[in-house]
Amino acid sequence: MIPDVGFLVLLTGALFICIKAAPATTDVDPTFEGRIVMEGDILIREEQLTERNAIALENMRWPDATIVYKLTGWYALFPGDIKKAMRHIEENTCIKFKARSNEEGYVKIYKGEKESCFADIGYFASEQRLSLGSGCKIFGRILHEMGHTIGLFHEHTRPDRDNYITVHEDNIRPGSKRNYRKTPSYMTRVIGPFDYDSIMIYGETAGSRDPMHLKSMEANKPGVTLISSRYKDRLTDLDIKKINTLYNCPGKEKFS
């Protein structure tokens, strides 16, 4: 998630980049390198936001279900859980990961500043970003951000989410309320049933102005607790089936 600050400084190699973000008191989406930051950790290009370009969503799938990546800096030396997450996805879906040679479209995986966890959504024929700051080097968080790279939006912002969860806007910090907007139906393909345990759902106190006492959202289903991806160690069966459906994976179980 990109922090709610007036200015965000990221370290990329030896280059310091100063990013003007939206003030924490507003509900305007901040920007990063020409992308709009949606829902806290999704980078999306402006041309992908208009209804007339909704067909572009079909082109956001990685060609041949192969994600081309480049590990940089710290992660090039210590790929650890990143490679483990890649193997977990490969073992359960038709998605493959390939180290970049000279491909035009690829995802650069790098160590962002502090809690800077975010990723471009899906495929684009240029360099894309997957930032894993020091607070994001956790297996479940890595899987979550890779889910965005694959093309998955958040489960709690599905257009039909109100049937399954209740968002308590009064409990959410002003600068975090934008992270709970429903994704427009023309931007996302709703696949399968709502998954309370998805790797793509936030914990129920994320963005709360008082996490010890106030929930940002909660399940409408009695007895269900919404848990952050940082405490998870795998994709759920529904996550896997959704990815296999999105990429029409041959020989894999899919939603009809």
UniProtKB/Swiss-Prot annotation:
Cofactor detail note: Binds 1 zinc ion per subunit.
Leader peptide range in chain numbering: 1-24
Gene Ontology molecular functions: metalloendopeptidase activity; toxin activity; zinc ion binding
Subcellular location as annotated: Secreted
Residues annotated as domain Peptidase M12A: 53-250
Broad EC category: hydrolase
Any Pfam family hit: Astacin
Prosegment residue ranges: 25-52
InterPro entries per the UniProt record, alphabetical: Astacin-like_dom, MetalloPept_cat_dom_sf, Peptidase_M12A, Peptidase_Metallo
The EC number(s) this enzyme carries: 3.4.24.-
Binding positions (Zn(2+)): 144, 148, 154
Reported tissue expression: Expressed by the venom gland.
Active-site residue numbers: 145
Cofactor: Zn(2+)
Function statement: Zinc metalloprotease. Provoques deadhesion of endothelial cells from cell cultures, and also degradation of fibronectin, fibrinogen and gelatin in vitro. Its role in the venom is not fully understood but it might act as a spreading factor that facilitates diffusion of other venom toxins. Alternatively, it might be involved in the proteolytic processing of other venom toxins or it might play a role in extra-oral digestion of prey.
Subunit-level organization: Monomer.
Name recorded for this polypeptide: Astacin-like metalloprotease toxin 2
Organism of provenance: Loxosceles intermedia
